[in-house]
A protein has these predicted regions:
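Sec-dependent signal peptide recognition
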Residues: 1-8
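Exposed, flexible binding/inhibitory loops of compact, secreted disulfide-stabilized domains
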Residues: 13-138
Length: 138
């Protein structure tokens, strides 16, 4: 009985979403190429932020307790594109970041301007691998 309870507890603990806080989200970034990022140190954060928004001061992150994960969609030809991190959860030794991408609906009007959608979040520090999964592909 105890073994069953411990197994159930371990399985539940691996699927409980981690808390996360949005640091920045928008459609203007210096990141022209689509990429997913995992940032574990202040030096990595300063470098990423300098590429992302060189004229703005990087938001403070306590890397002794947290890390940053994010998704950049790269350059898009119109408004209406969006990326959103939906959940961050441990799965075994990995931390899985689930996100969604949106684009303008077919046949709708969208401003013809270049955009660079992104979403950056702070999560509790995790030493293991980080995997990014497009929603629905878990």
């Amino acid at each position: 009985m105890l073994r069953s309870v411990l197994l159930a507890t371990a399985l539940f603990a691996q699927t409980v979403p981690a808390t996360f806080t949005t640091i920045a989200k928008g459609d203007v970034s210096g990141q022209q190429t689509a990429r997913q990022v995992t940032v574990r140190t202040a030096a990595e954060w300063a470098a990423l932020w300098n590429d992302h928004a060189p004229t703005e001061k990087a938001p403070a992150v306590d890397f002794s307790k947290n890390m940053v994960v994010g998704v950049f969609l790269g350059s898009k030809p119109s408004a209406g594109h969006e990326v959103e991190i939906l959940a961050v959860r441990p799965m075994g030794a990995d931390l899985v970041v689930e996100y969604t991408q949106k684009q303008p609906a077919r046949g709708t009007m969208a401003a013809q301007i270049l955009t660079e959608p992104f979403h950056l979040v702070s999560v509790p520090a995790h030493a293991g691998p980080v995997r990014f999964q497009l929603a629905g592909s878990l």
